[in-house]
């Protein structure tokens, strides 16, 4: 009730008095988290310091205090709290992850890698894998990063599906074609993983192997018939890679019937309607998508519609606004180049 009145400066008077009167760890912890959310870090630290001063501090209190210390670059203090948390045997993977972050902050990447190797499936599992890969890649050792992922899959088999996904994402950021092999291995191990199938479909589509990508998109639909996101992915891919626009429109119309407020689906349907020559319907949809989600890719679709209708001033204004917000964006650059639209200086 008090938190619901947070905009009232006097709303917390009763809470603070209750904390002072009872020294309730639960109330103090809730107040500390509220202060964190408001970015009142110094005030939040006062509350966390009081919490961890109690010998009976809970794991949540200790990890919360450590996370704040890391935010404040007080890594040594964070490590003390995290070691206490680890001794309690609860939320072990979370404590290990944040301990690794503290070690990174202290300039001990080797120690961080050792700890990250112990983090099991948990809230921060994907971030742990990403941090480890970033350390190893920054040292110029892609092979060591791959070995880390492979070892982790063996020691933490319950996290293997997510491991394959993060491993492939890491390789893709490096422009490595080995990402497809990792995804294929993952799909062999987890043939019903829509996450891995989506990732491989996206990779194959970008690499120019659309027939293979389409097969993956369709397998996702086989696993999740009628799923709006899967329908959108396949419909949008067909629009961009084939002239099967009527088929794509059918998929996207089904998608929007299931999720009518999704701006990605609205954009996709507007885009395929444009390809079908339904300019009036396309414009309504593309403008609505852009209103909800002013993304450069959505903007590029609307820019192309406007430009091909001879509405060059509107198109130039839109591309200028987007170019300022997202300079050198690939979608804007490709559209401008293909249509010979001058880009802003």
Regions picked out by a protein language model, each given a short descriptive name:
Residues 1-345:
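Alpha-solenoid helical repeat scaffolds
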């Amino acid at each position: 009730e008090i938190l619901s009145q947070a905009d009232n400066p006097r709303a917390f008077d009763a809470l603070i008095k209750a904390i002072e009167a009872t020294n309730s760890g639960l109330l103090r912890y809730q107040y500390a988290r509220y202060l964190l959310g408001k970015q009142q870090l110094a005030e939040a630290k006062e509350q966390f310091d009081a919490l961890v001063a109690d010998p009976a501090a809970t794991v949540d209190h200790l990890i919360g205090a450590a996370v704040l210390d890391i935010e404040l670059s007080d890594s040594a203090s964070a490590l003390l709290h995290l070691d206490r948390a680890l001794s309690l045997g609860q939320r072990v993977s979370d404590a290990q992850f944040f301990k690794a972050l503290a070690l990174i902050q202290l300039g001990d990447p080797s120690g961080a890698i050792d700890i990250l190797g112990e983090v099991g499936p948990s809230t921060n599992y994907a971030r742990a894998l990403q941090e480890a890969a970033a350390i190893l890649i920054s040292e110029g050792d892609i092979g060591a990063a791959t070995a880390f992922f492979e070892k982790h899959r063996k020691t933490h088999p319950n996290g293997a599906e997510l491991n394959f996904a993060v491993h492939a994402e890491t390789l893709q950021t490096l422009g490595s074609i080995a990402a497809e092999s990792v995804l294929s291995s993952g799909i062999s191990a987890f043939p019903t993983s829509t996450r891995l199938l989506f990732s491989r479909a996206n990779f194959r589509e970008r690499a120019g192997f659309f027939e293979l990508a389409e097969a993956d998109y369709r397998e996702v639909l086989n696993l999740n018939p009628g799923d709006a996101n899967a329908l959108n992915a396949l419909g949008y891919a067909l629009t961009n890679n084939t002239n099967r626009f009527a088929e794509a429109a059918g998929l996207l119309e089904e998608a929007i019937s299931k999720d009518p407020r999704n701006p990605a689906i609205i954009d996709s349907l507007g885009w395929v309607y444009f390809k079908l020559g339904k300019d009036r319907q396309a414009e309504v949809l593309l403008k609505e998508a852009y209103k909800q989600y002013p993304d450069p890719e959505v903007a590029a679709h609307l820019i192309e519609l406007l430009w091909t209708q001879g509405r060059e001033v509107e198109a130039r204004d839109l591309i200028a606004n987007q170019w300022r917000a997202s300079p050198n964006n690939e979608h804007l650059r490709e559209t401008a180049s293909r249509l010979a639209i001058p880009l802003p200086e």
